[in-house]
Amino acid sequence: MTPAETQKFDSLSVSVALAQLNPHLGDVSANCQKLLQMRERAAAKGADIILTPEMFLAGYPADDLVLRADFMDRIEAAISRLAKATADGGPAIIVGAPCRDKEVLYNSAFILDGGKIVARRDKVNLPNYG
């Protein structure tokens, strides 16, 4: 890297709030509310991004809950609610949640900012407990 390129990175500052919250297994609404409350506190402290643990919205391990359509509907509604909350210009959210894409389920991280889902990244290397 040239000195000019290094200087460009030296001036970049991002404040990340780690959401070390205890999600309730299967209680999507409560987990969403916890995250929204934490986002308010993080915004007051100047955070740019909030990062949650893997599968935060569902709780971990979600096991067979992710096979229920009504549960996945609640997950999708919570992601939409969280995304809309980011329209206020406050911190972006990176939230871990299960994702239903047609008939396939993923363990994903959603990047929410500016009132929408900006990106989704699916976990590639899943644990093998067998």
Please give the residue ranges for each predicted region:
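Hydrophobic structural segments
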Residues: 1-130
